[in-house]
Regions:
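Positively charged n-region of N-terminal signal peptides that target proteins for export
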Residues: 1-4, 8-11
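C-terminal motif of bacterial Sec signal peptides marking the signal peptidase cleavage site
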Residues: 15-19
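Mature, Sec-exported extracytoplasmic domains of Gram-positive
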Residues: 21-168
Length: 168
């Protein structure tokens, strides 16, 4: 009887130890484009993949992008409304009904990203052209981003101003 009890107890212990290990998300380490890809290219790919898998909640999308292995800073997200937005000077950005800004917790990294859900009043391409025409890569006084990128999937627009590679 003691052997059966000991065997049962050890099996329960093994089961408890192995059952507590959670699965890691497959999407948190997406760096598919290649070793020489820029940070913007990596995030565009990640965005397209997540959006094509049905992720439409902007905050969840932004947090997923910040979890990408290519990002080497602690990031934060915050909702934005149509109007004046950081990185676009005095241009009022309209044409969306939901928006999320994401970027580093400490702004010494020249990175800022936005996700916009378009409201249907503007064409996707025209909205992205307006963003690119008004974006200022030196929005942050001490640093400047190297590139900007815009991408669209299912009425959601990603816009990023970033260094070529994380850590620069």
């Amino acid at each position: 009887m003691k052997r059966i009890f000991a065997l049962t107890l050890s099996l329960l212990l093994i089961f408890a130890l192995t059952a507590c290990g959670g699965e890691k998300s497959d999407n948190s380490s997406l760096i598919e484009p290649g070793d020489d890809a820029t940070l913007s290219e990596i995030l565009e790919y990640d965005f397209q993949l997540r959006a094509s898998q049905g992720e439409t909640a902007l905050t969840a999308l932004a947090e997923g992008l910040l979890d990408n292995d290519a990002i080497n800073f602690d990031g934060v997200t915050m909702p934005v409304e149509p109007g004046l937005l950081m990185g676009f000077g005095n241009a009022e950005i309209t044409g969306f009904d939901q928006g999320v800004q994401f970027g580093p917790l400490i702004s010494t990294t020249p990175f800022i990203g936005y996700l916009f859900h378009l409201d249907g009043s503007v064409d996707d391409d025209a909205f992205m052209e307006k963003l690119e025409a008004n974006a200022d890569l030196r929005w942050n006084i001490c640093t400047a981003a190297d590139e900007m990128a815009a991408s669209e999937k299912s009425d959601i627009v990603l816009f990023v101003m970033a260094p070529l590679h994380a850590g620069e």
